[in-house]
Structure formats: structure tokens, C-alpha cells
Curated annotation (Swiss-Prot):
<comment type="function">
    <text>Functions in the N-end rule pathway of protein degradation where it conjugates Leu, Phe and, less efficiently, Met from aminoacyl-tRNAs to the N-termini of proteins containing an N-terminal arginine or lysine.</text>
</comment>
<dbReference type="Pfam" id="PF03588">
    <property type="entry name" value="Leu_Phe_trans"/>
</dbReference>
<dbReference type="GO" id="GO:0008914">
    <property type="term" value="F:leucyl-tRNA--protein transferase activity"/>
</dbReference>
<dbReference type="GO" id="GO:0030163">
    <property type="term" value="P:protein catabolic process"/>
</dbReference>
<protein>
    <recommendedName>
        <fullName>Leucyl/phenylalanyl-tRNA--protein transferase</fullName>
        <ecNumber>2.3.2.6</ecNumber>
    </recommendedName>
</protein>
<keyword id="KW-0963">Cytoplasm</keyword>
<keyword id="KW-0012">Acyltransferase</keyword>
<dbReference type="GO" id="GO:0005737">
    <property type="term" value="C:cytoplasm"/>
</dbReference>
<dbReference type="InterPro" id="IPR004616">
    <property type="entry name" value="Leu/Phe-tRNA_Trfase"/>
</dbReference>
<comment type="similarity">
    <text>Belongs to the L/F-transferase family.</text>
</comment>
<dbReference type="InterPro" id="IPR042221">
    <property type="entry name" value="Leu/Phe-tRNA_Trfase_N"/>
</dbReference>
<dbReference type="InterPro" id="IPR042203">
    <property type="entry name" value="Leu/Phe-tRNA_Trfase_C"/>
</dbReference>
<keyword id="KW-0808">Transferase</keyword>
<dbReference type="InterPro" id="IPR016181">
    <property type="entry name" value="Acyl_CoA_acyltransferase"/>
</dbReference>
Amino acid sequence: MLTWLTRDSLTFPPLEKALHDPNGLLAAGGDLTPERLVAAYRHGCFPWYQDGQPILWWSPDPRTVLFPEELHISRSLAKFIRQGHYQVSFDSDFPAVIEACAAPRDYADGTWITDSMRAAYCELHRRGFAHSVEVRREGELVGGLYGLAMGRLFFGESMFSRADNASKVGFVALVEHLKQAGFVLIDCQMPTNHLHSLGARAISRAEFADHLARHLDQPSGASWVR
């Protein structure tokens, strides 16, 4: 049975209570306050829903993640990066990145990044939890991604690309940055061919929860000014 959250409690049900079909649906309802969102990521779930639906909270099993030391950069991508087509920055324009991620895609109907989601994550950015990667070509924003950093874990949310390899260049820069700062895992949530090509793989929900328990409260050396 699906658990419905109330606005007066930040408690989520145990992850093992998530439904098998649809895979990982853990709870519904609640709100998108910064406190609830932080509690959700610390618990191992994330919001994902369409306009017109209640807020839905997910903890899929298996979970797609990338360990920084397993980043795979193809020869062609490595050559492209060396050619220096793009300039990469962190946290220089979070609102523009999430707006671009929310824009309609040719291959999808609508977007799951609603206006309320954008406002909520911009507030998390102001509070120092959410961070962005900007990829520019001659000053124009052509790619990027955003997510949350907690302890030594990074929770990826969405990425976009308006030019060849732009999101891949941004992702590689993020992984290298996180690796240097001592991060141990990047949560990619759901599988995609794009992420698998960069080294992401599936782990069990139990293994993911173990990483949360061990690394959420460990300090990292990440600096988000670049």
C-alpha cells in the first residue's frame, strides 16, 4: 500500500516498502520544502512527478550510480575535451541551468521539472545544497547539469545539451571535481545509455542505503567556485 505523506511530518517510510510496480514508488504527497527535500535525499528517495499529479517519491531497485574512479571517457570524447571547444564553470548560473533542464525535449512529452520543482531547487542552491555545472561556448550556455551535494555523495538530478558532447563535457568535469574532493558516489537515479557510456552501473537499493549510512555525514573538500 502506498504511503501518503502529511505536511506536518518529514518522516518517510522504510525504503523496503517501495512498490515493485511501478519500480521504486515509495510515497506520495507532502511538499517541496527545503527541509523535506533534504530529508528525502538523506533517506534515499527523490521526487519525480508530472504537472497535475501529486508529488511522488521514488527509491528504485536497482539504483543507477557512478563511482568516480569508474568514469569512462572514450577516446573520441577525450580528444574532444582536449580540443577545448567549451568552458566549464560551477555554480555560476544555477537558475539558467535548471531552466534549460526543464525545457521541453524533442523525445519526451512535457517535463517533470515543474515550476514548483524549479523554485524548490533554486532555494536549495541558495542554502548551499544544490549545485550546477555550466558548459559555455563563446559565452553561450550550451550544456549543463545540476544536483545536490551531501557529505561525500552527489545526487544528480538532470542535465541538458544544446551542442555536441556539451552535457558529457560538463559531467566529466563534475566527476573529476568530485573525485579530487573525496566524493565516493554519484547517484544517477535511473539508467540511461548516456550515463552507462560514461561508466554508470546499477547497484542494489540495499547497497545504495549502505553508502548513505557511511558517507552522508563525512566531510568533503569540495569547493564550488571555479
